[in-house]
């Protein structure tokens, strides 16, 4: 089973969207194998967004992601990365397909409610950044025996 990292950003947490987003994830068939509400500090934010160091928007990005709590998750399922990304929609909510999380809830590219890994490599890196191995659980959902 493939794993991916997904995070409800501060704007999503502050607007009370964690439950709605988790419901969508579970209804889609992805399994949450780790999850926690946390405050990201600058050091972790810089590691997470290392590829953007030196870009004009970097400081705003760090300021936003450290401005409030996030809900970090590890999801598991067949094709979990692509499935989660389709559910999220395009980065710019104005370009996101109707019915996606960003189209339905995001108001601006810089405040787009949710983050998700874009490749197996980034998923592995992000999961290791945000979760210790013992925080990631292995379990079988009741429905799995029927699939």
Curated annotation (Swiss-Prot):
ATP binds at residues 9, 57, 85, 91, 102, 112. Belongs to the NDK family. Keywords: ATP-binding, Cytoplasm, Kinase, Magnesium, Metal-binding, Nucleotide metabolism, Nucleotide-binding, Phosphoprotein, Transferase. The lineage of its organism: Bacteria, Bacillati, Bacillota, Bacilli, Bacillales. Homotetramer. It comes from Listeria monocytogenes serotype 4b (strain CLIP80459). Signal peptide: none annotated. Major role in the synthesis of nucleoside triphosphates other than ATP. The ATP gamma phosphate is transferred to the NDP beta phosphate via a ping-pong mechanism, using a phosphorylated active-site intermediate. PROSITE patterns: NDPK, NDPK_LIKE. Its EC number is 2.7.4.6. The gene is ndk. Its cofactor is Mg(2+). It comes from the Bacteria. This is Nucleoside diphosphate kinase. GO terms for molecular function: ATP binding; metal ion binding; nucleoside diphosphate kinase activity. Coiled coil: none annotated. It catalyses: a 2'-deoxyribonucleoside 5'-diphosphate + ATP = a 2'-deoxyribonucleoside 5'-triphosphate + ADP; a ribonucleoside 5'-diphosphate + ATP = a ribonucleoside 5'-triphosphate + ADP. NCBIfam families: PRK00668.1. It is an enzyme of class 2 (transferase). GO terms for biological process: CTP biosynthetic process; GTP biosynthetic process; UTP biosynthetic process. SUPFAM superfamilies: Nucleoside diphosphate kinase, NDK. It is found in: Cytoplasm. GO terms for cellular component: cytoplasm. The active site is at residue 115.
């Amino acid at each position: 089973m493939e794993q991916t990292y997904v995070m409800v950003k501060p704007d999503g947490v502050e607007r009370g969207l964690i439950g709605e987003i988790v419901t969508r994830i579970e209804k889609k068939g992805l399994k949450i194998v780790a999850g926690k509400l946390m405050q990201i500090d600058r050091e972790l934010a810089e590691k997470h967004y290392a590829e953007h160091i030196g870009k004009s928007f970097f400081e705003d990005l760090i300021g936003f992601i450290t401005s409030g709590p996030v809900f970090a998750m590890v999801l598991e399922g067949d094709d979990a990365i692509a499935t989660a990304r389709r559910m999220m929609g395009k980065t710019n909510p104005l370009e996101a397909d109707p019915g996606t999380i960003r189209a339905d809830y995001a108001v601006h590219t810089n405040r787009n409610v949710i983050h998700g890994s874009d490749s197996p490599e980034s998923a592995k890196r992000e999961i290791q950044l945000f979760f210790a191995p013992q925080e990631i659980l292995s379990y079988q959902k009741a429905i799995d025996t029927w699939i």
